[in-house]
Structure formats: structure tokens, C-alpha cells
């Protein structure tokens, strides 16, 4: 793997020509036309910033990470709106019967992005634990059973993508990111996280990463790394950090627990990579290149192999304007290049 690969996590603010019409036209030819146009426009932004991996083009086909797959699942109905973050809302579903896919969640999006860029792409998909945690359960016996049922249908989705990937990959490896923001919200349910995530990726031959953000305690996750069949972890750190310059512990409080990640990783025969959140997606402040450089250098003082470190925003950038999101990504790429020069 190359050193300090730069990547987007997933979402990016939609252009107004799509966002203002999204719910009115979803499922129509007009939606397809505008989603494709928005994807092309966003891929151009990502490519112009110099990103190594352009993700799925900013998730232009998806309104929200829970609602998008939930709308495509039989046995689940919606009751009303629930606030998630930054005054953003999603429709919370209730599972009232055995759940099954109505059709693919993401195949049309994956096929279009794959043919629209030559860059590596990474396909985010909301994980089984988060789907379970963000749903009401009015059918299954308990939370573990429901999580495993979500894992079953996510596994079906991933196997469909995997089966078609050789025909659209243009020689690129398949990269899948399981989005699990709910991972550590219930510390006593980490067994459910491990069981359901592993079930969801069973039989999938790809580079598999897990994205978690705004965790109460990442150590709960780090302790289970040996049990998870995951290749790497794309995590949020900058939101809990200062904006002071420097590579001392006191200047980089948000990155302290990477030391524990490294301890766990060093005990493994097959090392995991870590995608480090070096820009905060919940503020408009555009991190100066020097600040991002210091965050990267701090991490490399802990994890000595730069090929085990990827760089990304904390989370998806959909909460920021497109211009601010673009500048955050651009500064991240410049910082990466400067650090590589320093360590070469």
C-alpha cells in the first residue's frame, strides 16, 4: 500500500440543483440525470484537489446514510423524523416483519462512479449494528437477532457488488467501507458489533474498512480489533483536537488514543491500517496546511510505517458548503505531500 493515501469518507454537500429537487424527483429519470451530473461535478472537485481515492463521488444518490437503505428494505416502515447531528434529521424506521432487500441499495451508483473516474473508489455502506440501533424493533426477539438480520441483507448487497465488480473495475481493487457510527454507543453490546459486522462481510474479497466517528471511547473498539475481519479503520480525531500548532502531546489531545490503537496493532501478525481524521467536518474553519501537517507528523511519531496510515476528514463533508469542503480536502492533500517530502 502507498504511504499516506488521501481519501474522502463518503458524503459531500449536494449542489442545489439536486438537493432542492431530491425528494420531488427521486426514482424518476430526472433524478438519475441530476444525480449523475452532481456525481460528475463532485468527482471533478475531488480529482482537482489531488485526492488519491475519490470514494463514491460524495454520495449524490443518497439523501441520508440510514434512510437510503431503509427505504429499500421490506418489513420496515417509517414513523417520523429524528434529529441526528447539526440540526439534520432522518426518518427512523420500525421493523415490523422479516426484513429483505427490495433491490440493490447502491449498484446503480457504484456502476456510474466506476465508469466516471479512473481513480480508486471506495464504497461506503451503512453497517448492520447502526441499522439495528437506529431502528425500532417490533418483530425480532432481541437486538442481536435484528443486527444479524441486517447483516444478512447487507452481505447480500456486498455479494451483488462483488459479483459485478470485475466487469466495471478497470483493474482497480474492490474497496468497501462499513459505516458504523453507533459502534461504541452501547459499551455492553460490542459482541453484537463484532458478530454483525463479521457476518455482513462474510465471503467478501475486498479491502474492508470500518468507519466510526464521535465515539465515546475508541478503546472499546480497539480491544475488539483482533476479532474483527476488517483491514483498516477510518476514524474521527480532529473534532476532539485543538487547533494549536505543534506535535507535542499537549497540542494534540484529540490523537492520544492512537497510542493504544498502535499497541493493539503491534500485537497482530497482520497489521491494520488506520485512516486518520485530520480535518473537522463540523466547523467551517479551514485547517491551515501546517496544522494538518502537525497532526500527520504526530501520528507518524506513533505509527512508524506511513503505509499503515491513511488521511481523511473526520466524517462525510455534507454538513459543510462545497467550497469549504473542497478547501479542507485540498489542504489535506498539500499537507500530505509536504510531509512525504520531509520524511523521504
Curated annotation (Swiss-Prot):
Binds 1 zinc ion per subunit. Its cofactor is Zn(2+). Keywords: Amino-acid biosynthesis, Metal-binding, Methionine biosynthesis, Methyltransferase, Transferase, Zinc. Pathway: Amino-acid biosynthesis; L-methionine biosynthesis via de novo pathway. The keyword Methyltransferase applies. Zn(2+) binds at residues 211, 213, 236, 315. Belongs to the archaeal MetE family. Catalyzes the transfer of a methyl group to L-homocysteine resulting in methionine formation. The physiological methyl donor is unknown. This is Methionine synthase. It comes from Thermoplasma volcanium (strain ATCC 51530 / DSM 4299 / JCM 9571 / NBRC 15438 / GSS1).
